[in-house]
């Protein structure tokens, strides 16, 4: 067991019965020329987030945590995105951007595309799990819940993009399913203005989970921390 300093209070968990969730670290969300950038969102400050996720993943893997990578997107025909009868059709900024810029049709968040791929710096390793997801929440229409329950995992540590959309949506759904969710704030990035990041973190630490940072997380997983707790 290890204790992680967090807001609003510390949380204790067993790393070997916990998972690090990396949400949508795709070119679409973190790279110039990707979907978010083309849709008018600022991705200029995502590089430190990528580096911090690398650090968190390395520490989590060494501590025996399961690493789960999400990729958001749909089939090449966008059947999985839903048609006009789906609210996703009307609210997805990727779909709206392609409708407004027909030359982008088939390029944004389509499985197999550069946009859909994880950024070059983040490479899943053997033993990691990579899951596609068709909506903001990683629990919707994916096997995430059954994967976690079959392994006795109840604690989830979140990183990725976007804090105020897919990260928060997945953590909230996990809360409703009795999972303990922690966000590493400097390993996440918002879609939109800075206040969106602050609002998402406020919601999480006040109502749905806990907030910490990468350095504190790595310190908690270090052998000396385990020795102190034991």
Curated annotation (Swiss-Prot):
Mind listing the GO molecular function terms for this protein?
hydrolase activity, acting on carbon-nitrogen (but not peptide) bonds, in linear amides
A Pfam family cross-referenced in the UniProt record is Isochorismatase
Identify the keywords attached in UniProt to this record, alphabetized.
Hydrolase
Q: What does the entry say induces or represses the expression of this protein?
A: Up-regulated by the nitrogen regulatory protein C (NtrC also called GlnG) and repressed by RutR.
* Stored InterPro entries: Isochorismatase-like_dom, Isochorismatase-like_hydrls, Isochorismatase-like_sf, RutB
EC annotation from Swiss-Prot or TrEMBL: 3.5.1.110
GO BP terms: namely:
nitrogen utilization; uracil catabolic process
Question: What Gene3D superfamilies does its record include?
Answer: Isochorismatase-like (3.40.50.850)
The entry's active site is 24 (proton acceptor), 133, 166 (nucleophile)
Catalytic activity annotated for this protein? (Z)-3-ureidoacrylate + H2O + H(+) = (Z)-3-aminoacrylate + NH4(+) + CO2; (Z)-3-ureidoacrylate + H2O = (Z)-3-aminoacrylate + carbamate + H(+); (Z)-2-methylureidoacrylate + H2O + H(+) = (Z)-2-methylaminoacrylate + NH4(+) + CO2
Q: Which family does it belong to?
A: Belongs to the isochorismatase family. RutB subfamily.
- So what does this one do? Hydrolyzes ureidoacrylate to form aminoacrylate and carbamate. The carbamate hydrolyzes spontaneously, thereby releasing one of the nitrogen atoms of the pyrimidine ring as ammonia and one of its carbon atoms as CO2.
NCBIfam families this protein is in? RutB (TIGR03614)
Q: Which PANTHER family match?
A: ISOCHORISMATASE-LIKE DOMAIN-CONTAINING PROTEIN, PEROXYUREIDOACRYLATE/UREIDOACRYLATE AMIDOHYDROLASE-RELATED
Protein name per the record = Ureidoacrylate amidohydrolase RutB
């Amino acid at each position: 067991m290890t204790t992680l300093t967090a807001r609003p209070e510390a949380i204790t968990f067993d790393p070997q019965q916990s998972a690090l969730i990396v949400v949508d670290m795709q070119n679409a969300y973190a790279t110039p020329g990707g979907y978010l950038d083309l849709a008018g969102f600022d991705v200029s400050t995502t590089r430190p987030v990528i580096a911090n996720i690398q650090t968190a993943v390395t520490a989590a893997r060494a501590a025996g945590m399961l690493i789960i990578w999400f990729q958001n997107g749909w089939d090449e025909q966008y059947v999985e995105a839903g048609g006009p009868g789906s609210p996703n059709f009307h609210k997805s900024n990727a779909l709206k951007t392609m409708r407004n810029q027909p030359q982008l049709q088939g390029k944004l968040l389509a499985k197999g595309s550069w946009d859909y791929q994880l950024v070059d710096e983040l490479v899943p390793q053997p033993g990691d799990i990579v899951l596609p997801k068709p909506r903001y929440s990683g629990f919707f229409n994916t096997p995430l819940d059954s994967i976690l329950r079959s392994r006795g995992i109840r604690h989830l540590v979140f990183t990725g993009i976007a804090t105020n959309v897919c990260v928060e949506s997945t953590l909230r759904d996990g809360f409703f399913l009795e999972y303990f969710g922690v966000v590493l704030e400097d390993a996440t990035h918002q879609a939109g203005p800075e206040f969106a990041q602050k609002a998402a973190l406020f919601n999480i630490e006040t109502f749905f989970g806990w907030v910490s940072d990468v350095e504190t997380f790595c310190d908690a997983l270090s052998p000396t921390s385990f020795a102190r707790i034991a």
